[in-house]
């Protein structure tokens, strides 16, 4: 299978994602520059963490208008798998591909730590190798990770199984302790924590590896974990 990793000016987690997919999981991976058109043939597109366009205006606000995002939107609306990690999550909300928004952390400080996450929905292309209710440890590094959404949309997301990960110890004030969500079609997913930073035994934590293995399992035709 073939993964595409979008690189914006200011991206800094693209290499980590590439390394995990290429060297740890032996997948075909290609970088996609923000000024390029999105080519055909990708099985999954990843928007990595970082500070796209310097986070000017607000996180993800400029990146959503990049040339490559035109293709990403078409790809997503056609059912293609799209993942946004940290800044990538912010971009997906700004682009309207995911509900809600990411704003300043409640404590108004940048947080860099490892935090417990609860897998709240295992029936998705991104979590099918986890067990529902499983608690994992994943690094976070963000200043604007406070997820906000209106009560009506939140209720709909809960009903439709769109909340995939919640914080065990809410570090940023996110509504409903939300750490990761997907769209109604379950093909577009965003999360603030960094699974790519917990996918190699050398780092002492492989809890994030099953995130990428879930995508691979789904693309190979495997069933989601009910």
Curated annotation (Swiss-Prot):
Keywords: ATP-binding, Cytoplasm, Glutamine amidotransferase, Hydrolase, Ligase, Nucleotide-binding, Purine biosynthesis. Its main location: cytoplasm. One of its GO terms (cellular component) is cytoplasm. It is found in: Cytoplasm. It catalyses: N(2)-formyl-N(1)-(5-phospho-beta-D-ribosyl)glycinamide + L-glutamine + ATP + H2O = 2-formamido-N(1)-(5-O-phospho-beta-D-ribosyl)acetamidine + L-glutamate + ADP + phosphate + H(+); L-glutamine + H2O = L-glutamate + NH4(+). Pathway: Purine metabolism; IMP biosynthesis via de novo pathway; 5-amino-1-(5-phospho-D-ribosyl)imidazole from N(2)-formyl-N(1)-(5-phospho-D-ribosyl)glycinamide: step 1/2. GO terms for biological process: 'de novo' IMP biosynthetic process. Its EC number is 6.3.5.3, 3.5.1.2. Disulfide bonds: none annotated. NCBIfam families: FGAM_synth_I (TIGR01737), PRK03619.1 (NF002957). Part of the FGAM synthase complex composed of 1 PurL, 1 PurQ and 2 PurS subunits. This is Phosphoribosylformylglycinamidine synthase subunit PurQ.
């Amino acid at each position: 299978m073939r993964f595409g990793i979008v690189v914006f000016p200011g991206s800094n987690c693209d290499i980590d994602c590439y390394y995990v997919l290429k060297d740890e999981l032996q997948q075909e991976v290609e970088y996609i520059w923000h000024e390029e058109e999105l080519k055909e043939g990708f099985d999954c597109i990843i928007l990595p963490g970082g500070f796209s366009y310097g986070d000017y205006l607000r996180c993800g606000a400029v990146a959503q208008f990049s040339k490559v995002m035109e293709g990403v939107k078409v790809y997503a609306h056609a059912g293609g798998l799209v993942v946004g990690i940290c800044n990538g999550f912010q971009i997906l909300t700004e682009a309207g591909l995911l509900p809600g928004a990411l704003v300043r952390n409640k404590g108004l400080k940048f947080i860099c730590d490892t935090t417990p996450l609860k897998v709240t929905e295992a029936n998705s292309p991104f979590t099918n190798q986890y067990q529902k209710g499983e608690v994992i440890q994943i690094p976070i590094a963000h200043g604007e990770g406070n997820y906000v959404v209106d009560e009506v949309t939140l209720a709909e997301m809960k009903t439709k199984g769109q909340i995939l990960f919640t914080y065990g110890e809410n570090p940023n004030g996110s509504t409903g302790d939300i750490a990761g969500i997907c769209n109604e079609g379950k093909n577009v997913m965003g999360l603030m924590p960094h699974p790519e930073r917990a996918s190699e035994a050398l780092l002492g934590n492989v809890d994030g590896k099953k995130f990428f293995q879930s995508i691979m399992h789904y693309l190979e035709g495997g069933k989601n974990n009910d």
